[in-house]
């Protein structure tokens, strides 16, 4: 029987052959049909998730508006200070340059221990990133004011304050606006990455689409961000057109220019107010909602929705903070700080990564529960019933070719395999580092990639061995051979609910509600739920709702 990857390759080759066999008119017709099909899927996505996209758009607008305002204020102030103070200039300009060179994800992660996750973190990073074009455009504009203009102003009796506001700053406005246009477009794009730290915004749609293999959702989120950036650039260009803002400040703007500037500002303020009002809980909840966090994967989105829907059914207000980048590394400290209230964790991750136990020790759930309560004031509320442990997988064809059943068998033939895994797999002691010591693999090549690209790389034959989670839907879709960990290297990764102890005091009924999920999901059930989201392209919320209804919860 043909593997799914081979089948897809045959379809692709057949499509290319048909395309080359067609005349130009037929090719154009096919292209039009494909475009209509894509647009149809996008329209359906927008229709089905209208409220979801409006929420994200409002969040994104507020993030960009606040960060853009702060960037403009601080950027101009720093640029002016650098212009007037040569010692400060020698320090400030290189620092602004340096901040811009730091990878954005690293900067987001850097501030998590200091100010936590969410909007505050996102605003700080966006402001630091957005300073460069504003600072340099302000500084260069002030520096380029001609000497004869300055002398003429002084000759007319301008004092230093008037010289700055009526000459330097007034002449610098067009260049500052040019810098602002660059900064705003950059902020619109950068704000999308803020979704990884729970800041919300349209990036959430992109990362959710990536994590759940939902290309339509990914494209929809990307298109809205692209449209947003075009409109944001257009907004700033109104002030720049025919030097409208400069002429307004110099009190010689035409009525048409005044009308355009004031209308532009009025529309902006209206949208800002509308976004703020939209994001106020529509059911006027006065009490602070519980924040449910998840890691960035389909399984976690589904489990997060199961928790959220179950608690909401019992009238407990919920806020979703799904797809937090870095997983446990960022969620656990945020939970301790109170930024999040509960999430799904795995016993193996808790045992090795959080509690720092050696891999040689067997995972002991009772010890995990006691230490979490004692050291972090966190409670484990039972286990769901499935073990999403690591394993390694290859194609069934390669398994048959080399007679591979176990990790040890793979080690003997590892020189014939290109191995791929997510970035953190190569760094963790309970993953690649320890695995190499236990099995002595000598792979032909190693490929680090985003966790959601492993299977695509396998399908495209860039790798032929990879790490998997035993509940992954793609194991079933691609008909992979999951190998046996014959030395028992990987610990158990039983899924359980971790919640702040204070929440149980506030909502004592939450404990009994969550305990209803104890032992309700086995490995096959979890793999099927993942399959519905990643392969059948169902919404995690719909899948979670159907699952709870089947359980009578």
From Swiss-Prot:
Residues 288-549 are annotated as: Ergothioneine binding domain. The chain crosses the membrane at residues 61-81, 98-118, 122-142, 182-202, 219-239, 261-281. InterPro entries: ABC_Gly_betaine_transp_sub-bd, ABC_transp_perm/SBD, MetI-like, MetI-like_sf. PROSITE patterns: ABC_TM1. GO terms for biological process: amino acid transport; glycine betaine transport. Pfam families: BPD_transp_1, OpuAC. GO terms for cellular component: ATP-binding cassette (ABC) transporter complex. Residues 57-236 form the ABC transmembrane type-1 domain. Changing residue 454 to A: Retains EGT binding. It is a multi-pass membrane protein. One of its GO terms (molecular function) is transmembrane transporter activity. In the N-terminal section; belongs to the binding-protein-dependent transport system permease family. Part of the ABC transporter complex EgtUV involved in the uptake of ergothioneine (EGT), a natural low-molecular weight (LMW) thiol antioxidant which protects H.pylori against bleach stress. Responsible for the translocation of the substrate across the membrane. Also contains a C-terminal periplasmic solute-binding domain (SBD) which binds to ergothioneine with low-micromolar affinity. Cannot bind the structurally similar compounds glycine betaine, choline, proline, carnitine or histidine. This is Ergothioneine transport permease/ergothioneine binding protein EgtU. It comes from Helicobacter pylori (strain G27). The gene is egtU.
């Amino acid at each position: 029987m043909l593997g799914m990857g081979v089948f897809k390759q045959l379809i692709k080759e057949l499509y290319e052959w048909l395309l080359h066999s067609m005349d130009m008119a037929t090719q154009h017709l096919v292209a039009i049909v494909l475009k209509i099909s894509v647009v149809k899927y996008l329209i359906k996505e927008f229709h089905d998730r209208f409220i979801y996209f409006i929420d994200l758009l409002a969040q994104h607008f507020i993030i960009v508006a606040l960060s853009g305002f702060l960037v403009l204020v601080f950027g101009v102030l720093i640029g002016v200070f650098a212009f007037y103070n040569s010692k400060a200039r020698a320090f400030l300009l290189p620092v602004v340059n340096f901040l811009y060179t730091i990878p954005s994800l690293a900067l987001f992660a850097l501030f998590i221990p200091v100010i936590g996750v969410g909007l505050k973190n996102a605003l700080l990073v966006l402001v630091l990133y957005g300073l460069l074009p504003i600072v340099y455009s302000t500084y260069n504009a002030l520096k380029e004011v001609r000497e004869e203009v300055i002398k003429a102003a002084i000759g007319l009796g301008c004092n230093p304050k008037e010289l700055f506001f009526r000459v330097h700053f007034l002449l610098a406005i067009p260049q500052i606006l040019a810098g602002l246009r660059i900064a705003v477009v950059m902020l619109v794009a950068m704000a999308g990455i803020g979704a990884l730290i729970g800041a919300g915004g349209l990036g959430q749609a992109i990362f959710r689409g990536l994590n759940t293999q939902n290309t339509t959702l990914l494209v929809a989120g990307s298109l809205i961000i692209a449209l947003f950036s075009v409109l944001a650039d257009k907004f700033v260009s109104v002030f720049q057109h025919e030097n409208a803002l400069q002429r307004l400040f110099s009190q010689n703007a035409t009525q048409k220019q005044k009308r355009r500037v004031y209308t532009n500002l009025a529309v902006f303020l209206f949208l800002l107010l509308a976004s703020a009002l939209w994001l106020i809980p529509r059911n006027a909840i006065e009490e602070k909602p519980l924040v449910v966090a998840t890691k960035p994967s389909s399984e976690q989105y589904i489990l997060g929705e199961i928790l959220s829907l179950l608690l909401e059914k019992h009238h407990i207000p919920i806020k979703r903070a799904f797809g937090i980048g870095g997983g446990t590394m960022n969620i656990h400290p945020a939970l301790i700080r109170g930024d999040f209230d509960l999430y799904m964790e795995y016993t193996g991750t808790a045992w090795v990564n959080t509690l720092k136990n050696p891999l040689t020790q067997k995972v002991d759930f009772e010890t995990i529960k006691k230490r979490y309560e004692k050291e972090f004031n966190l409670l484990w509320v039972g286990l769901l019933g499935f073990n999403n442990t690591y394993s390694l997988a290859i194609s069934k064809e390669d398994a048959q070719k080399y007679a591979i059943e176990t990790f040890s068998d793979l080690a003997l033939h590892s020189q014939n395999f290109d191995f791929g895994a997510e970035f953190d797999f190569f760094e963790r002691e309970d993953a690649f580092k320890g695995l190499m010591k236990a099995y002595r693999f000598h792979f032909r090549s190693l490929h680090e990639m985003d966790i959601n690209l492993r299977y695509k790389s396998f399908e495209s034959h860039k790798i032929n061995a990879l790490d998997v989670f035993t509940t992954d839907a793609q194991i079933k879709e691609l008909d992979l051979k999951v190998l046996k960990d014959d030395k028992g290297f990987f610990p158990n990764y039983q899924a359980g609910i971790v919640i702040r102890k204070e929440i149980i005091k506030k909502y004592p009924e939450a404990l009994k509600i969550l305990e209803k999920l104890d032992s309700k999901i086995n490995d096959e059930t979890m793999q099927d739920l993942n399959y519905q989201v990643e392969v059948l392209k169902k919404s995690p919320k719909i899948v979670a709702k159907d699952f709870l209804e089947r359980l009578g919860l």
